[in-house]
């Protein structure tokens, strides 16, 4: 782990290996296994690392350009096997100082394996920790970035709130959070769950409307510098079982992703 990141931690890792700090956070992570690893190793990680997907969308390109223009070290949250915005930042600014993080140790280990074996990359560190328990000191991180990192947080609305408050706590005064998050039509989702007999997802409650990301960001204290539609579509069978059930019932579930530049007040 290189500077400045190694100076930001408030407590030692559970273990250190090959320059990576591990904080034993797999319980809060997406569930990946060896079948996923086989897909990643078949070329998926290489395609993800060299993808121009975010560079070709005006909303996400605005985030990437802003990260580079700001110039400060940036921490990618919940990077997953796509590594979020970091590959795009590295394509345009190879020397930019970045830390990619995820709660899943397998994701981090596989990124380390891929990068060491296939790329000549500098100023890109890796760490494992949960967004709901970020091991950084207060007011230390100048910039975070993410792609549906908050949207995929476990434990429903409670998990979203905990993760967002951790990001806000650890950002420096006037620090930035560049993120793309997804909102889904919860009323339509609940209708599909009822009519299909499927068990509703944890944290999805019919008597409490799900807040928008704008509402969540403002509640925590962020200033919304910019908000742009990244993608607007309908959930399909290719997404998951809920999308399949929705198609069979003829119910459209709106999925809207927006790109935000947020600043800590």
Describe the predicted segments one by one.
Residues 2-44:
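N-terminal, positively charged/glycine-rich alpha-helical extensions of SAM-dependent methyltransferases
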Residues 50-71, 87:
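Conserved alpha-helix/loop element of class I SAM-dependent methyltransferases that forms part
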Residues 81-133:
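Class I SAM-dependent methyltransferase SAM/SAH-binding core
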Residues 145-146:
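A conserved beta-strand element that flanks and buttresses the S-adenosyl-L-methionine
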Residues 153-166:
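A short, conserved alpha-helix within the catalytic core of class I
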Residues 171-177:
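Short glycine-dipeptide loop
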Residues 178-201:
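Conserved class I S-adenosyl-L-methionine
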Residues 204-221:
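Short alpha-helix
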